[in-house]
Amino acid sequence: MAGHSHWAKVKHQKGLTDIRKGKLFSKLSREISIAARLGGGDPTFNSRLRRAIANAKDEGVPLENITRAIQKGTGEIAGSHYEDVLYEGYGPGGVAVLIEAATDNRNRTTAEIRNLFSKYGGNLGAAGSVSWIFQKKGRIVLDGDQNDFDRVFEVALEAGAEDVEQKGSEIEVICLPEKLDELQKHLDTAGLTIKSSQITYLPKNSISVTDKETFKSLYRLLDILEDHDDVQNVYANFDAPQELLEQCE
């Protein structure tokens, strides 16, 4: 599918230090809490919670952390009240940046995100300023070593997938957001191994970034945003030459 962001590839290549792993666990737990608060603590009847739990398990989040996050969301134990916030802005080179955040203090997070944009050569925009550049989609990732691509392709398309693509050792399936749960059930029923599934944003088009200094500035901005405690996901609509991407590995 055209318009896939290179940022997803870059951050996947970076790997996890202990500090980053701790932050990832915290962010995954926060998503579980929000999902439980909005849709209840039973994953059988809460698809967002079901996906959040599966993704947390895939990343190695301990079961007790998952249980505690659910209980915080349902109010069974005390915890912060988090809400979803979507931030939009432009980075160096005119690259559109979309940020999903989960915060217990919207004013604090907004001020901090605005400061990061300004500090690293971008600017935070108003609601709707860049979201039109992205499409909301369902995304399922399967293990390419444990699944036959042709089989995944066949089952996914029959179940309504829009796109199936081999990406290194993984197989990526893209669908409409409302088709995600149904598609995942079809893949599960077919005995295919799913690594993760989520609602994501894909850019409709991409901006080519070829200047080294512009790319470095853009990377610094995206990296610092990704590292922010309240930020869950960062999306950007850029393409860059392989030699620039390799500098981030």
From Swiss-Prot:
Q: One GO BP annotation here?
A: regulation of DNA-templated transcription
| Taxonomy, superkingdom | Bacteria
Coiled-coil annotated residue ranges, if any: none
Could you tell me the keywords of this UniProt record?
Cytoplasm, DNA-binding, Transcription, Transcription regulation
- Using the UniProt record, give the first listed, main subcellular location: cytoplasm
Q: Does the keyword Cytoplasm apply?
A: yes
Q: Do you know which Pfam families this protein is assigned to? A: TACO1_YebC_N, Transcrip_reg
List the GO terms this entry assigns under cellular component, sorted alphabetically: cytosol
Q: Which GO terms describe its molecular function?
A: DNA binding
List residues traversing the bilayer: none
Localisation: Cytoplasm
The record, for SUPFAM superfamilies, names: YebC-like
**Keyword Transcription regulation recorded:** yes
Which family is annotated?
Belongs to the TACO1 family.
Protein name as annotated: Probable transcriptional regulatory protein Minf_0651
